[in-house]
Amino acid sequence: MARTGRRPGQTQTREGILAAARNQFAERGYGGATIRGIAAEAGVNPALVHHFFGSKDQVFVAALNLPFNPSVLVDSIVEGPRDQIGRRIVRLFLGLWQHSETRAPFLALLRSVANSPEVAQQLRTFMETAVLAKVAAALNLPTLRLTAAASQMMGLAMVRYVLAAEPMASASDDEVADLIAPVIQHYFDA
C-alpha cells in the first residue's frame, strides 16, 4: 500500500523541493516556473512548498542561494524619508557585500550572469517582479528609474568587488556612500 501524507525527513523533503525548483527554474525560467510545477516534480503537495518557503520568490532565493530576502530588501528601501532613499540603497547594498557568507553567493551570481543568458534571464525576471516593480509601486515611480538605479549599483559591484579596481575597492563604505548616494537619489527625486 502506498504511503500518503507527509514524507519522512524535513531536510530530505526540503532538499528535494529545492532540487525540483532548480530544475523548474532552469527549464522554464523564473516567470514560467510555478509552485504547482515545483511541487509536482518534487512529488509533494504545493502546500508543502509554501510551508517550507512561503512564496515562489523565496523558493527562487533558496534555490539560487541568494543571500537576501526580497521582502526585507523592498521594505528597507521604501521605509524612511524619501530624500534618504539613495543613501539607504547604497548602505544596504554595501552591507550585503561586507560578509563572506553573503559576498560569496553574490560574486558567484555576478559571474554566472555574465556567462549564462539563462541565469541572467532568471535573475532579471526575478528582480523585475520581486524587487523593482514592488519598489516602483510603493514609491509611485516609473520602473525605468529603478532600473537605472539598479544599473548603477551593479556597476558599483563590478568595479568594487569583481574587478577590485582601486581606489574604489579599498575606499571606506562611508566614502563610497558619500560619492554614490547622491547619484542614486537623483533617480528618486523626479
Q: How would you describe each model-predicted region?
A:
Residues 97-128:
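Amphipathic alpha-helical segments used for helix-helix packing
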Residues 47:
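Key DNA-contact positions within bacterial/archaeal DNA-binding proteins
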Residues 61-89:
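Amphipathic alpha-helical linker/stalk segments
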Residues 120-125, 135-187:
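Hydrophobic/aromatic-rich alpha-helical bundle segments in the mid-to-C-terminal region
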Residues 1-44, 54-58:
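Basic, helix-initiating cap at the start of DNA-binding domains
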Residues 56, 67, 85, 101, ...:
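Hydrophobic/aromatic residues within well-ordered alpha-helical segments
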